[in-house]
Amino acid sequence: MNITNLILMVIVLGVAFAIVRRFIVKRQNEEAEDKIQVDDSTYTLNVMTEFVKKRLDEITKINLYDIGLSEEELKRRKNKKYELKKALKGCTYGDVNDKKYIKELIYDMLFNEYGVDEINVSKAIPFDIPSLLTAQDKFDIILYMYKNEFGYEALPEVIKKYNLDDLKYVEGEAKPCYVITSEEISKIYEQENFILTFEDKLNVVVQRIYQHYKGYSSIDEIRDMNIDGISGGVSGLPESFLSQVAQTDGDYLSQIAEHKVPRACDSIWIMFHGKSIRLAFLSFGSEAELKRVCQNIYKYNNPGQLSDTNGFKINEMKDGSRVVVVRPSMSETWAFFVRKFDVKRATLEQIIRFPGKDEAIDLLKYLVKGARIISLTGEQGCRKNNNAYGYD
């Protein structure tokens, strides 16, 4: 009997020792993981984005009751956790306040925890070597600097200052069109000759991380601007077409690979003062990213699931913008249209710029004053609603 008890005691002690040892090793591994392993890729956008995702996931899923906090501290931490969850959800609805909160949190994480400084911040975006900056990098910097001065009028100010809404001829097009090219963005960046502080650089990096994590990809900041609207995926070749020609036309595929033929995920258009302007220098990068934006941009107030059987959704965003989203098989590709109604009112003289406009404007005014029944037709973004409701 004594021998049996002794054996049981040895077994229990052995199991207890194994559990304690495993716990200690696990804690040591966790501490080792918490330390940032610095290498050549540590401060790239992709790696920092994964770090931000992991940290925010840890913060929102931590069990506060296991930490042993005081009652007051527990209440405070619970409120902060609730606010964070609410803000992360509100980001996808277009709430600019939630967006600002999350961006400030990401800024603190990168600066205080991840160790981003004046030197390594340029590993994410090569701020100090303009020749290595992409058109999107330059545009992000331009928009950030103008936003500091003009707020949500930043993009309209850039467009008006450099006449980016004028008709122009571009290579491969027989007719003039409304388009903003990467060459124009590079020229603007060179002329502006911005001097960026470390805070400016880190804020640009934070915005880039945010827009691929919780934002609307390349259009995230543009959507907030005071413009008439924005759309994506509405032109260019869909993935379904690319797969069909994959085994038939090698020359055509080589043109696509060189980005000479625009894809649907390269399609970004803004509506500005009644003009549909293509942003040729911007892209979602892949159909998966365009799909992610489409799946998030319409979800304010839970309008229902966008599915193969229900291939479109019409809804409003939190700021009152109207959003329409379509998906295959109803459409050839994923696409969205966002119309904003909080822009400055344009006059008829600004909208109608063709010869003989005075007579057309006077006629329209008298028809409205006479309470006549009028049918207003035209392409998307030509301000039919504004005329109908008397805003113009």
What does each model-identified segment do?
Residues 5-23:
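N-terminal signal-anchor transmembrane alpha helix of single-pass membrane proteins
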Residues 22-29, 390-392:
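Short, intrinsically disordered, charge-balanced linker/junction segments flanking boundaries
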Residues 29-306:
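N-terminal accessory targeting/assembly segments
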Residues 229-237, 317, 321, 387-391:
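Short amphipathic alpha-helical patches
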Residues 255-370:
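P-loop NTP-binding catalytic core
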Residues 360, 364-392:
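Glycine-rich phosphate-binding P-loop
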